[in-house]
Regions:
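Rossmann-like S-adenosyl-L-methionine
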Residues: 1-128
């Protein structure tokens, strides 16, 4: 509620419907959600339509972020990125592409699935 504007992109249509319903039920009017593939939606045109953001929270699928999405993020020079990942290997690959523009300032692994090999890893990146 305190943010000026929140834009959500989700690949699962049902999750977008649920998010829109939740926002409506909670009288939150500063959000907009779009369903689709991030690499197709997150473009210069998308950014010009929605404006430049001061924070990106990304939680890509196991394959990680598409290189075109990373290129758009680098062009934006968003001050902070919170990168949540269920695959530390692809997260590491993506962070390698971001390292010239962003510093890793915090890392927090989270064991959401005890007694399995799965771990969520959260990284805070800040613009250099």
């Amino acid at each position: 509620k305190d943010a000026k504007k929140v834009i959500g992109i989700e690949s699962v249509e049902e999750a977008v419907i649920s998010a829109k319903n939740s926002a409506k039920e909670n009288n939150i009017t500063n959000v907009d959600f779009e369903a689709g593939d991030m690499k197709k939606l997150f473009s210069s045109e998308f950014i010009s339509r929605h404006g430049i953001c001061d924070l990106i929270i990304t939680d890509p699928p196991r394959d990680g972020m598409h290189k075109d999405v990373i290129k758009e993020i680098i062009k934006l020079k968003t001050p902070k990125i919170v990168y949540v990942s269920c695959n530390p290997s692809t997260q590491c690959r993506d962070l390698e592409l971001l390292k010239d523009t962003y510093d890793i300032t915090k890392v927090q692994p989270v064991d959401m699935f005890p007694h399995t090999d799965h771990v969520e890893n959260i990284v805070l990146l800040e613009l250099k």
